[in-house]
Amino acid sequence: MLLSLTFPVLRGCTGHLVNRSLQAPRWRVTWKRSYSLLQDEVKSLRTVVNPDISKIRNIGIMAHIDAGKTTTTERMLYYSGYTRALGDVDDGDTVTDYMAQERERGITIQSAAVTFDWKDYRINLIDTPGHVDFTLEVERALRVLDGAVAVFDASAGVEAQTMTVWRQAEKHQIPCVCFLNKMDKPAASLRYSLDSIKAKLKANPVLLQIPIGSGKSFTGLVDLITRQKMMWQGNALTNDGRSFEINSLQPSDDPNVLLAVSEARAALIEQVADLDDDFAELLLGEYGENFDAVPAVKLQEAVRRVTLARKGVPVLCGSSLKNKGVQPLLDAITAYLPAPNERNHDLVRWYKNDLCALAFKVVHDKQRGPLVFVRIYSGSMKAQSSVHNINRNETEKMSRLLLPFADQQIEIPSLSAGNIALTVGLKQTVTGDTIVSSKASAAAAIRRAQAEAESRSNSHSAALAGVEVPEPVFFCSIEPPTMAKQADLEHALNCLQREDPSLKVRIDPDSGQTVLCGMGELHIEIIHDRIKREYKIETHLGPLQVAYRETILQSATAKDLLDRILGEKRHVVSVELTVHPLKENSSASCDITFEEDVKAMLPADVREAVENGVQSAYLQGPVLGFPVQGVQTVIQNVRLESGTSAAMVSACVSRCMLKALKQAGGQVLEPVMALEVTVGEEHLSSVLADLSQRRGTICDIQSRQDNKILLADVPLAEMMGYSTVLRTLTSGNATFSLELSSYEPMNSQDQNILLNKMAGLT
């Protein structure tokens, strides 16, 4: 059970050292380090509300599902003194998995923000999902972080979702530290994991620790920088991991360990010298005769420079479940990952000391309404103050400011740059919005940017880059139990959409039904469950359907004339346009261009009305009414009489577009998923046979320890209920992950089958 964070007994964050060398030989020193408070003490964040920005670390934990992210987070909270008991995913009593569905399923769905202190540092930590249906949660967490910890299962190496998340981190140029978890598993392999990081992530692993023992005999680590041995005594049942012994390596230690450390440290020094010129000069200048004599502090500084430059990734190891190796990981976070002022954000410098923050998540609280997570990039945020939302052009009053501790919060008066906060009272703000102190502040930032670039007045935005929202791939209808509950359902869906932008809700124009669009079966299932649990509405879901797309096969030109009298006004507009298929990439977004003379002739408001008409037509393709992709529209002529409204222009353009799309011939595009299945060799043939019946294309079959890794491309429509089938085929001894690969044209036979199915003929 989570206890109050405001316990009156306050202690410093630094662990204390107890000398245990009384019975040791004089030349040998043994230390026992305790990294937590007494069992009945819980620390309070009120000790330091606004730490120095150099002491802040905004960190994300990311990995494949079941690699141990949440367990690692729980150990961090325990050893730093913010929880009394060790939370366990299997027991359903973790701090960061606070939604009922998360505790039942043992997976992380929403990115829970946790703030805690480690030694002299403030760590704002985000625990992100490892399931592909919740990729947006990872994306929006990474958008506001300065560093990341990638957690790997040491017996599996780099897995499918790890590669997806790693690509997201690379896009945001986030320095990373790798943690090889589950070193206690019999199949755990340090060498395999390092090779996997090199081969699959194209990263440069910088090994900082080697394990002592393997499998069940894994008892400790050796730090290659300091040459110190860390040993945890007993097992997870008898030792919570708070105390462990640190010994300097001695000649009397195991010769195999000494040899392994000597070779690994020499390799580390050589690798860092190759990656960091300053360190290479230091070695050749002062330590040319004996590289191994380089001081640990100099080596650590070089590793930090390599990490911040993203030339290499420090690799540590341990077992979070067995309470081993987490404290050194916390030390590595503070030692190697950047402070907020070490990350470059171009736009932020134009605000100088004024407030600039990004809203990266919204959750709903029944008593307090919407709670908005914000990352403060510059200036400070104060409770009971007004702030301006640049994206919505709205000024709102923020009533309260909170520090997040999973599902608990501490109220604070203000918070400075570099921190992550939770705000109450921002009712219009959604994910990706930029928050500043005032309209005047935003205008001043734009002026500074223009002066620096000596560019035109409209070439700069005062808004930070938002969060990219992926397109949904599944949809289904949702109905309330009675019409009396329709308004309640609409309110629930509005709240859930603000929390989760990857959830789309639309009204079917033909049936009038409410339609949910999501990222996968599990995503839709979780939304359905939340409506029942949190809003007490028993809804009915229709059959799950695939979100297809459409494109065109050839170019076509169409003309249209609209001549209509509304009231006493006559509206006349004529349009001519041509649509072309974008052959090089049928999955590309659509494009709109005007011929030069047309663009020069039309006023800006008419051009906007034309673009709205084209965009409206792109929403419904000519074959099945799915959204259109891979089409370029060229506007060749637009003529209208004075008094013609913008709405009539849009209507005429949309009607003309529909003609052109039909003439061009439609093609259905289906989502194709990249599938990775991990299965024992004894079940491989049955899995392959099943995939061949699902129109799957086998890309590769790899080996990982005793398992086979099957990589395939499979149409999403064929993957409905695959988890149940795979469990049956392999007696539960297989795992799989899916990721959207591309939209591909369906062959004529499959398209006809789909057309008949949609028409209700099959």
From Swiss-Prot:
Annotated positions binding GTP: 63-70, 127-131, 181-184
Function according to Swiss-Prot or TrEMBL: Mitochondrial GTPase that mediates the disassembly of ribosomes from messenger RNA at the termination of mitochondrial protein biosynthesis. Acts in collaboration with mrrf. GTP hydrolysis follows the ribosome disassembly and probably occurs on the ribosome large subunit. Not involved in the GTP-dependent ribosomal translocation step during translation elongation.
The EC number(s) this enzyme carries: 3.6.5.-
Gene assigned in the entry: gfm2
GO biological process terms, semicolon-separated: mitochondrial translation; ribosome disassembly
Domain named tr-type G: residues: 54-341
Transit peptide: 1-35
GO cellular component: mitochondrion
InterPro entries: EFG2, EFG_II, EFG_III, EFG_III/V, EFG_V, EFG_V-like, EFTu-like_2, G_TR_CS
GO molecular function: GTP binding; GTPase activity
Protein name (Swiss-Prot/TrEMBL): Ribosome-releasing factor 2, mitochondrial
